[in-house]
From Swiss-Prot:
The disintegrin belongs to the medium disintegrin subfamily. This is Zinc metalloproteinase/disintegrin. The active site is at residue 334. Gene3D superfamilies: Collagenase (Catalytic Domain), Disintegrin domain. Expressed by the venom gland. Keywords: Calcium, Cell adhesion impairing toxin, Disulfide bond, Glycoprotein, Hemostasis impairing toxin, Hydrolase, Metal-binding, Metalloprotease, Platelet aggregation inhibiting toxin, Protease, Secreted, Signal, Toxin, Zinc, Zymogen. Zn(2+) binds at residues 333, 337, 343. Glycans are attached at residues 263, 293. Binds 1 zinc ion per subunit. Residues 197-395 form the Peptidase M12B domain.
Length: 483
């Protein structure tokens, strides 16, 4: 059984903010400097892992203290995850690396119900977190003999090319009229409880991208793993688990002709996937990561409603930004097309309740992380009308149960509440069980160990959305579209 170690990192902000610096993610004009200091809490029956199942970080953002809770994304890789590259003489070399003890995490900010986080802890902390509606990126500064990290906003990254970057999918390109008409209906709250679905994703890296990263396969692997971790986080609200099934790097040469005409390349890649890749490894959808510049400022393309189709369950994504978060948003967008989603602008005046969302035809600044109501409608209609079978089954992987750790703010196996302090009036710190008479110990719909009354406001509305309200049956504050 995998044991858990709870870790607290105190990040002290450096006395000054940097004005400009060159990072892996690009040139950044304004950033904060933080220094990790590791403080280890005593776990229960701890057996040291290289990467803990649950971690906690403290840092200051804009001078305010922030607590970041992280939990390992155990569904990131399939159990039979494989990596393939090619020798100089063209031989295919496939390995099945052990990825159970990996370094990719999801999480949230303490006391911020709308927060999210997607972090790699492989070599310092790298990724993003959303705090009070703002997206921040964090990455190591790579200074000698230093644990310094930079925290900054996406808008502070210098843009090399200000031309708008577009998705190549057009309104009626590979669309289905009956699907499109049905998707104009608003979903009822019951319909918006999306069923659990699983996508086993194959990612293929073309030879141009291999050369771009100086023939460094390890660097490409880390980049792809970070990318899929981010994609997985963005699809969680739709109850879709994205699992990386295989990674193939065309290290010797391209196995199709990669052309600047994106529609031609997509067709060739779809044919190759159907006739070659699917016969070697089972998976649900394949996307090609490429370094080529597509004509028309296009950075991505996919077949709409193509999921589970042998030829059409494919997409193209240009690795056009050094910031992996940006490329992850593009692939999230193209996967949305595979799942039946159209562009938000293509709704004939219908309000989508989102100014900048993932399915906007042009990538926004900063890149969007949310799906609009229109996208949710499209996805629901796709599930109803097409019922794609390949995404029904959960991917094979080792299901590990964490050993309970008090105070990590995640409920582990056998816990009814997160123990924390022995003085907690609702939760018994010795057993991690609720005290007699207690219904809950924490949560936005918990007050003095009892569930708040039904329809009590637990999260104030933002924009056009209604307030979120308690159900009276749980300590959780459900999104309005989950009620």
């Amino acid at each position: 059984m995998i044991q858990v170690l709870l870790v607290t990192i105190c990040l002290a902000v450096f006395p000054y903010q940097g004005s400009s610096i060159i990072l892996e993610s690009g040139n950044v004009n304004d950033y904060e400097v933080v220094y990790p200091r590791k403080v280890t809490a005593l776990p229960k029956r701890a057996v040291q892992q290289k990467y803990e199942d649950a971690m906690q970080y403290e840092l200051k953002v804009n001078g305010e203290p922030v607590v970041l809770h992280l939990e390992k994304n155990k569904g990131l890789f399939s159990e039979d995850y494989s990596e393939t590259h090619y020798s100089p003489d063209g031989r295919e070399i496939t390995t099945y690396p052990s990825v159970e003890d990996h370094c990719y995490y999801h999480g949230r900010i303490h006391n911020d119900a709308d927060s999210t986080a997607s972090i790699s802890a492989c070599d310092g902390l790298k990724g993003y977190f959303k705090l009070q509606g703002e997206t921040y990126l964090i990455e190591p500064l790579k200074l000698s003999d230093s644990e310094a990290h930079a925290v900054y906003k996406y808008e502070n990254i210098e843009k090399e090319d200000e031309a708008p970057k577009m998705c190549g999918v057009t309104q009626n390109w590979e669309s289905d009229e009956s699907i499109k008409k049905a998707s104009q209906l608003y979903l009822t709250p019951e319909q918006q409880r999306f069923p659990q679905r699983y996508i086993e994703l194959a990612i293929v890296v073309d030879h141009g991208m291999y050369k771009k990263y100086n023939h460094d396969s390890d660097k490409i692997k880390v980049r792809v793993h970070q990318m899929v971790n981010h994609i997985n986080e963005m699809y969680r609200p739709l109850n879709i688990a994205i699992t990386l099934s295989l990674l193939q790097i065309w290290s010797n040469k391209d196995l199709i002709t990669v052309k600047s005409a994106s529609n031609v390349t997509l067709n060739l890649f779809g044919n190759w996937r159907e006739t070659v890749l699917l016969k070697r490894r089972s998976h649900d959808c394949a996307h090609l990561l490429t370094d080529i510049n597509f004509t028309g400022n296009i950075i991505g393309l996919a077949y709409k409603q193509g999921m589970c189709n042998p030829k059409l369950s494919v997409g193209l994504v240009q690795d056009y930004s050094s910031n992996v978060f940006v490329v992850a948003v593009i692939m999230t967008h193209e996967l949305g097309h595979n799942l039946g989603m159209e562009h938000d602008e293509e709704k004939n005046g219908k309000k989508c309740n989102c100014k900048t969302c993932i399915m906007s035809p042009a990538i926004s600044d900063p890149p969007a992380q949310l799906f609009s109501d229109c996208s949710k409608n499209d996805y629901h209609t796709f599930l109803t009308n097409r019922n794609p079978q390949c995404i029904l089954n959960a991917p094979l992987r080792t299901d590990t149960v964490s050993t309970p750790v008090s105070g990590n703010e995640f409920l582990e196996a056998g816990e009814e509440c997160d123990c924390g302090s022995p003085s907690n009036p609702c939760c018994d710190a010795a057993t991690c069980k609720l005290r007699p008479g207690a219904q809950c110990a924490d949560g936005l719909c918990c007050d003095q160990c009892r569930f708040k009354k039904k329809r009590t406001i637990c999260r104030i509305a933002r924009g056009d959305f209604p307030d979120d309200r308690c159900t009276g049956l749980s300590n959780d504050c459900p999104r309005w579209n989950d009620l």
